[in-house]
């Protein structure tokens, strides 16, 4: 179809025939340190697990070497829901289920953006990051979140859950 349109042929349907079907939200997981002006990171992705039930575009596996010579984006994670809020909640859950260990990523930053009241209310603009930097880059909250994640992982491992082994 793209080739036909590029050749000047009309689309097979009109704008009035386009039907909206829910909401989609995409985040781009990058090997970047958000606290250091999104400085690209390189190294080995020691452990990788993509979230289930979401569209994830990636070419990663545990042990992937992230070189400094290419774009820092390592995965696109996309949710789709009947409403914007459903899509947002699915994406928040999916980011929480994403395991990207051994390399600094913007995963925590993305989670904070999706959970921020301004984003939740639909009021985010192109000034969102600059206007909300204090809460989006809160290092103490990040340490607490990582400690909670590690504690949960250790608890699951002690209960015999092999998903983390």
Please annotate each region the language model reported:
Residues 3-165:
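Catalytic cores of soluble metabolic enzymes centered on carboxylation/carboxyl-transfer
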């Amino acid at each position: 179809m793209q080739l036909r349109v590029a050749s000047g042929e009309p689309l097979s349907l009109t704008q009035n025939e386009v039907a909206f079907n829910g909401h989609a939200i995409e985040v781009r997981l990058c090997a970047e340190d958000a606290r250091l002006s999104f400085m690209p990171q390189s190294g080995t992705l020691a452990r990788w697990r993509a979230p289930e039930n979401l569209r994830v575009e990636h070419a990663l596996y545990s042990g992937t070497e992230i070189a400094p010579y290419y774009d820092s984006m390592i995965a696109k994670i996309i949710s789709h829901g009947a409403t914007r809020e459903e899509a947002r909640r699915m994406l928040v859950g999916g980011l929480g289920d994403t395991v990207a260990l051994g390399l600094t990523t913007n995963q925590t930053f993305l989670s904070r953006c999706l959970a921020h009241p301004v984003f939740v209310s639909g009021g985010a603009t192109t000034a969102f990051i600059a206007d909300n930097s204090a809460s989006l880059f809160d290092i103490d909250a990040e340490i607490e979140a990582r400690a909670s994640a590690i504690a949960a992982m250790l608890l699951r491992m002690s209960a015999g859950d092999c998903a983390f082994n």
